[in-house]
Structure formats: C-alpha cells, structure tokens
Regions:
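Short amphipathic alpha-helical segments with heptad-repeat character
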Residues: 25, 117-128, 135, 161, ...
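Short beta-alpha connecting loops at secondary-structure transitions
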Residues: 19-23, 68-70, 278-298, 320-335, ...
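A helix-coil-helix interface module used to build multimeric assemblies
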Residues: 1-198, 204-217, 280-281, 291-295, ...
Length: 476
C-alpha cells in the first residue's frame, strides 16, 4: 500500500532473514511453541494434561488466524488472551489448558529473548563475513605504503592493509561482545506474575523440585543453557540495554570504517564500488559519491541513538515491572537489529568491491616523503662529518621554503633538490633518493598484518564461515 507509512528499515534496508525474525509469524508461532512446551512439561510432571491435547496444539503452530486474534483483542483489550483464544479455536481439546499457570510475560518475554538470540546469531554470521572480506583486503595490500594521518594531517607512513586491521580490530571486539551476549543469554522461564512462581507452586502442590524442573524442560526445548536465576514479572530490561549497547558498538565500528573510506574516496586513493550505470548526482554527471558508506554512517547514528531507549527503560522500571517498557521496546529493539543487519549487509557489499588506486597513493606518498626522510638524511650527513645542530636548522629552513612553494605557488615538492644543492650536506641527488624508498618507512606493517590475521582474526571467525556464503543485494 502506498497510502500507509512503511519503515525504510523493512522496505529498503534489512534482510529477509532479520525481517522474519521480528515478524508476526515468528512472534506468534513462538508463543504457540512456548505454550506447547509448557503443556508438555506440565504433563510430564503429573498435571492432568493428555497427549491428545498436546498433539492437537503441536498440529497448529503456524496456522494463525490473525483476523480472529485482532477481533478478540478489540473485545478483551489484551493481546495474549486474544491469542490464547485464537489458539483454542483451532485446538479446542486443549483450549482449557493453554497458558496454564503462566502470565503474559511467559510468552512475551521468552519470545523476546528467543528473537534476541536469533538476531544475534544472524549478526554474528554477517560480522564474521565482514571480517573475512576485510582480512582478504588487508592481506592483499599489507605492503602497499600509504600516508598515515593524525589530525587528518600527513604523519608517518603506514600501509593500506595495516590501516584495514584497525577497522578489523574494532569489529573483532564487537564479535567478542556478540559471542558473550549469545553465550550468557537466558530465558525468563516460568516465573509467574511477580517472579515468585507462586502459581506453579500451587499447581504442583508445593513441590519445588517440579517447579524447577518445569523451567529446565522449557529451557531445554528452546536450546538455552538455563533461565534467569531471579526476576520480577519480566526479565530485567538491562538485558535489552546490554544487547543494544552491543549493537551500538558494531555501529560505532562500522561508522569509523565508513568515515575513513569516505575521506579516502575524497583523496581518490580508495573507493567503494560504483556500478556501471550508477548516477552520482542529478546535476553533476561526473560525480562518484560514496553513498554506501554514507548510508552506513546514517544508519549507525540511528543505532547509537536508539541504544539509549532500553537504557532509559531499564533505569525507570518500578519494582517487579511497569508497562512503560512495552511500547518502547516493541520499536527500539527490533529496529536496532534491523539497522545493524542493514549496516553489515552494506559493509559486505562495500568491502567485497573496494577499489585501490596505487598510483594516486604513491603520488601522495612521494609528495610528503621528502619531509619524512629528513631525519634519516640528517643522520647520514652527520656520519659524513656534518654538525647535527647546524644541519637541523638548515633542514628547517629548507622545509619551510619547500612548504611555502607547495602551498602558495601550487608547485611540486623540491625538498630533495634544495638539499642536494646545499654544500653543508655534501650529498648528491642520487644519494638522497636512496632515502626515499617508501618501503623503508613502513616499519613492521606487513608482519603486523600477517600476525593479526593468523593469530587473532582467522581463529575468531573460522567457526562462522561454514555453509553458503552471504550474498547481499543493495537497494540504491
């Protein structure tokens, strides 16, 4: 429909997999799976529930009549009870035991945790793919000297590949955070209205071992290591805050990468992919805008800002729970996942097609290298009998003059010619040029790249690169 607002995150940016994870089908079929799990555990622990009732429920996990649910919710003003009713319509023999002993948070919060886990698993896969692509890029360009920048002013040389490891190092931190969140995520379990499990103690005649076993069976059904040890009615909203802080961390790293790439594209040293028929500007046909990187930055700002929502929600929950969390988390949590999913998809696309222009890079290097080489030139001249302090002053004078020529007259750097013509140095132009090999100024860059990839990156991403390669289609 074109007359109803549609979020760009769903219509333009996020993947089908992530969209499904936060879809109504995923949500409400998971509610039904949770009701089945509860009924099976209660039956196994001695409550009067039959296999026939469980079988009937299991046969109707996905055939959700949303019209019936919507109509019922209008009548009772309660989404969970509307879906209990709707489930009971297709599983009439089980209608009387659906949701037995549970409160709304049993299906709502446990489903939220499941969606968070599945979302993090999707993020982890894409994050590992980004790191894999960047590792290939870093390895290919580990020995390509390039200007390093501090304050966005030319500094000492680095290499194109070494710079890529800086992006990767931050993403590797993010991968560790994602892994930690997945590993430590726990279900709410079956805690009852205020977290005391009083309703289940009543059902099981005060048998605490059965109440605890009930939760264990439910957690096992959904592949969790356990349930939260204590809670109010809901799981702590700090879990949402921590999850979105992790997603915001990915957004931070992605924005840093994309910002650097935008600056490199301005310098014409490295460019993001640009398709054959892509139009950069409606008015300036020659333009090649870094729109993918700009989109990464735009979405990253959204995620970083969005991460404040669950933080405020967690900080303002009262006692065992208040409902002012609900409307906010319905928006903030899924949309953070959708945005990060989009960011990582764009990054995979960009990193897979980065274009490096070595000749431009070399020209920029050679324009600055004469200044960088002056310390080595000075030491060589001292070895030939020169006075270090006098040579230092003469280099300062030549540097100022060469810099003025470049900045005010737009001419090339003539620092080498100035020193070659200065008898104080006693060096020919050829001798000076020996000091202008860029590879002599990159330190351990190639080795650092090799070590980082072999010792840190590849072991970390190897478990997640099995199976079909992720293919990303970007909607421009």
């Amino acid at each position: 429909m074109n007359n109803v607002y549609e979020s760009p995150l769903s219509s333009r940016y996020a993947s089908k997999e992530m969209l499904y994870n936060f879809s109504s089908d995923m949500k409400f079929s998971t509610w039904r799976r949770l009701w089945v799990s509860l009924a099976k555990a209660e039956m196994a622990l001695g409550l009067p529930i039959t296999q026939e009732q469980v079988d009937e429920m299991e046969a109707h996990i996905t055939d959700i009549d949303y019209d019936v649910a919507r109509q019922r919710e209008k009548e009772v003003r309660h989404d969970v009870m509307a879906h209990v009713y709707t489930f009971g319509k297709v599983a009439p023999k089980a209608a009387g035991i659906i949701h037995l002993g549970a409160t709304s948070a049993y299906v709502g919060d446990n489903t939220d945790i499941i969606q968070i886990r599945e979302g993090l698993l999707l993020v982890r896969k894409k994050l590992a793919t980004v790191l894999d692509k960047l590792a290939q890029f870093a390895d290919a360009h580990k020995a390509q000297p390039t200007l390093g920048f501090t304050h966005f002013q030319p500094a000492q040389l680095t290499t194109v590949g070494k710079r890529a490891t800086l992006w990767m190092n931050e993403l590797l931190m993010d991968l560790g955070e994602v892994e930690y969140r997945i590993e430590n995520l726990r279900m709410l379990g079956s805690k009852g209205t205020t977290g005391t499990q009083a309703s289940f103690m009543e059902l099981f005649d005060g048998d605490e071992s059965k109440v605890k076993e009930l939760e264990k069976r439910i957690a096992d059904d959904f592949g969790f290591a356990g349930v939260v040890p204590v809670s109010g009615q809901t799981y702590s909203r700090k879990i949402d805050a921590q999850t979105l802080a992790t997603l915001a961390g990915i957004a931070e790293s992605a924005s840093k990468f994309a910002t650097d790439l935008r600056l490199l594209q301005h310098l014409k040293e490295v460019e993001e992919p640009f398709e054959k028929n892509q139009i950069g500007s409606s008015a300036m046909p020659y333009k090649r805008n870094p729109m993918r990187s700009e989109r990464i930055c735009a979405l990253a700002r959204y995620v970083i800002t969005d991460s404040l929502n669950p933080a405020f929600t967690s900080a303002t929950q009262w006692f065992e729970r208040t409902l002012d969390d609900s409307a906010n988390k319905r928006i903030s949590v899924p949309e953070a996942f959708l945005a990060v999913d989009a960011i990582l998809g764009i990054m995979i696309n960009v990193v897979s097609g980065l274009v490096v222009y070595p000749k431009v890079i070399e020209a920029h290097v050679m324009n600055e290298l004469p200044f960088m080489a002056t310390e080595n030139i000075m030491m060589d001249a001292v070895k030939r009998g020169g006075n270090r302090q006098e040579l230092h002053e003469r280099i300062r004078e030549h540097s100022m003059a060469a810099g003025k020529r470049i900045k005010e007259e737009g001419l090339e750097n003539d620092m080498v010619d100035r020193i070659a013509g200065d008898p104080m140095f006693g060096m020919t132009r050829e001798q000076l040029l020996e000091h202008l090999d860029p590879s002599a100024y990159i330190g351990r860059c190639p080795s650092q790249v090799d070590e980082f990839l072999s010792e840190c990156v590849r072991p970390a991403i190897a478990p997640y690169l099995t199976g079909e390669e992720i293919k990303v289609e970007i909607n421009l």
